Each structure stands twice: as structure tokens, then as C-alpha cells.
Amino acid sequence: MDDETSVKEKQRNSDRISNLPDSLLCQILSDLSTKESVCTSVLSKRWRNLWLHVPVLDLDSNNFPDDDVFVSFVNRFLGSENEQHLERFKLIYEVNEHDASRFKSWINAVIKRRVCHFNVHNEVDDDDELVKMPLSLYSCERLVNLQLYRVALDHPESVSLPCVKIMHLDMVKYDADSTLEILISGCPVLEELTIVRDPNDSLEVVCVRSQSLKSFKIDSERYESQNHVVTIDAPRLEYMNLCDHRSDSFIIHNIGPFAKVDIDVIFNVEYNDPLEPDDSSKIAMLGKFLTGLSTVSEMVISSDTLQVIHDYCKMEQLPQFSNLSRLHAYFEDTWWEMLPTFLESFPNLHSLVMEFDCFPDTEQIDLSYVPQCFLSSLEFVHLKTPYVVNMQKEGRPLTGTSSKRKLAKYFLENGAALKKLTVSASFCNIIDEIKAIPRSSTSCQVVMD
């Protein structure tokens, strides 16, 4: 009897769901993947074609037995008479010029349905075969999120994307330098922009001008071509990540006054060919770049960038970073002599993380000068050696003992505001010595992570 009651209860619940209006059922199905949504068509006649009216199309061609089945499926969905707005469209597919006509008809159909979230991931390998997006993409009035991977963009006469807030352009090729600039300028409420550059793209200038942009990331691997420029004018920018070993010039006209930045750039300066006094144009550009960053509140800086700054400091004085409260810097063992002068540029520094690949086996490092932040603001210091934490387990000696001791002593004896010094596990052989060092701040703790 209990089993019969349970079966009837399940039937009643099933009927309740089936009796819901189409609009609500489609909203429920939109939380499923398209594959799962289609599976509901076998439940009953009521559900047979319901998936065609779901405002989401999320498809990966790799989940289909062959290309013909995939094409037929997409054609059926987009070729239906349904004109309901699409909330999300995601397509993972290998598209080349041979498929261009069919692909563009799909995209035009999606744009006609006023899509909000648009994501095309092209799996083609040949750069010469990248399919061009239709020009209709530049006037999609409801579009909020645009993500493109390995496609080509034609030069537009105009762009009107009034609702786009998020744009990710990954390995995209542009018809001209101005293509990207016009695209960005046509997004008046854009807040998040990510650009991952194709090594073979033809861009010489990446120009980012936006009054609304809050987050900007660029990722560009090293490439032989030179004279590439990145220029940024985004007065509301709150976060910027420059990971670019390709461009040799960075021009910051404007960013937010308390932005957070992550900098890994080399300005086309080779490790074995450092900056020289006669590189006047490069030195001037570096000075303007650093001045453009001088209002930030938090900064992560790579060892490659710090190498260039190390060379720059031999010829010019760093600007004052008066707003900077948090700094995470990756140091090479040969740049320690710049540490006091470097930290003098951060008078209000609150937290410092110094990360090292290794420590030099020497005490011949001058750490006598005490920066202003040691006396008034620096409360937290973390000395990290992430690549040698397991050296003892691997049977390798812990190197740089004397320099580790000297560095820890430098912070403890001079850090009048210091509350905590954290050292990595590679300090384990001298941790007791470090804890015994007299401290300028009586409230300072020494801990090992």
C-alpha cells in the first residue's frame, strides 16, 4: 500500500510540473545544459519540442557523434520560428573559412534574437583559417557579455553595444589597429576587458580608452616583432593586470587613483642587454609609465619588471607611490642593493611580500639605509621562498643562511611599526636565531609558514 501511495504521489508531482506554463518550464530548463534540456523531450508529448523555446543554447560539437548531427541540431534550434530573446549562447566548434557562410547565418540568427551573453570558442588551429564574425555583431543592443576565442574581426564603420559590460577577446585577429579601439569605444558601459593576444596578430597599438572600465587584463607572449605600444586611458580603472612581454612601450594616461595592479612587463629590455644611460627615449617612457602607476594602492610586480626598474634606478629616481599600502615583489638574489632605495618610494607601505627564487651566499649587501615606511607604516612583512620549501626533503642543502639572517635582522631591528614578520620554511634552520634578534617594535611576532 505504501509503495502504491508513493507511486501516485510521484505521478501527481510530475503532473504538477507538466501543468506549469511553457514560459516557466523554459525558465527551469534554462538552468540545465542544452544536452540535458533536450533529454526532457522524451518525457511526454507535452515536453517534445519545449527545448526549442529555452532561451539558452550551450553547445560543444565534441559532444555530438559527428559534424552532420551537430549542424542539423543547431540548424533546427536556430531555424525554428521561435523569435524569443536568447539569454545565453555558447558555441564550441571548429570553424574555418569553408564553414563561414553557415557559421555567419547562425550568428546572425542569434543576434536577431537579441542575445545577452555571447560566447564563441573556435577550435581551429590554422591562423589563416580564422573565420570572420559578421558585422551584425557590432550592433547587438541587448548584449551584456561578449567572449570570443580564435576568430577574426573586420573593421567596423561604427559600433553600438550599449549594454556590454564584460568583453573577453582571446587570440582574436583584428583587421586594423583601429578595429579594437572602435570596438572598445562603442561599449559605453564596459566594465571588464580581457585581451589575450595572438602571437600573429597585426596589432601594433593596443589603445584602451574607456570612461567606464573597471578591470583590464592583457596577456601577450614574447614575439620577435617590435615597436608595439599599449596605451591606457581609463580614469575609473580599479584593477589592471599587464602580463605583456611583447610590447616595448606602455603609456598610462589615466587610471583610478587607488587601483590594484599586477605588472609583468619587460619593455623589450633583454636580461643580457640591460638598460643603458644612452637609451634616453626608453628611460623617459619608463619614467612616465611609473608616474602613471604612482597612485595605485596595491601592486604585484614580477622579477622581470623589477629587473628593468633596477636598471632604471641607477639612472633616475623612482616617483613616490604615496597611496601604495600593499606590495608583492619577486626579487632576484642580485638586486638586494636596490631594496632600501626601492622601498623609500612607498612612504605609506603597510604590507610587504618579498618572494625569492633563492638567497645569495653572502653578507656583502648594504642594508644600512632605513626607508620612511619602516618607521611609520610597515606592519606586515612576508619573506617567501616557494621553490625551496621542500629542499630538505629532497636532500638539498638550505642555501643563503647568512643573507636570510641579515634580511630578517634588517626588518626586525628597523621596523618600528612592524607587527608580524613571516618567513618561509626554508628559514627553519635559523628560526630560533631570528626570534632572538632584538626588535624595534616590541609587539612584533615572528612566525614561520
Curated annotation (Swiss-Prot):
Matching CDD domains: F-box_AtFBL13-like (cd22160)
One Pfam family matching this protein: LRR_At5g56370
SMART domains per record: FBD (SM00579)
Gene3D superfamilies: Ribonuclease Inhibitor (3.80.10.10)
Domain F-box: 14-60
LRR repeats: 62-93, 123-150, 172-197, 218-244
Organism of origin: Arabidopsis thaliana (Mouse-ear cress)
Record's protein name: F-box/FBD/LRR-repeat protein At1g16930
Domain FBD: from-to ranges: 362-425
InterPro entries cross-referenced by the UniProt entry: F-box-like_dom_sf, F-box_AtFBL13-like, F-box_dom, FBD, FBL13/AtMIF1-like, LRR_dom_sf, LRR_FXL15/At3g58940/PEG3-like, LRR_PRU1-like
Keyword set includes Repeat: yes
Native organism taxonomy: Eukaryota, Viridiplantae, Streptophyta, Embryophyta, Tracheophyta
Keyword terms: Leucine-rich repeat, Repeat
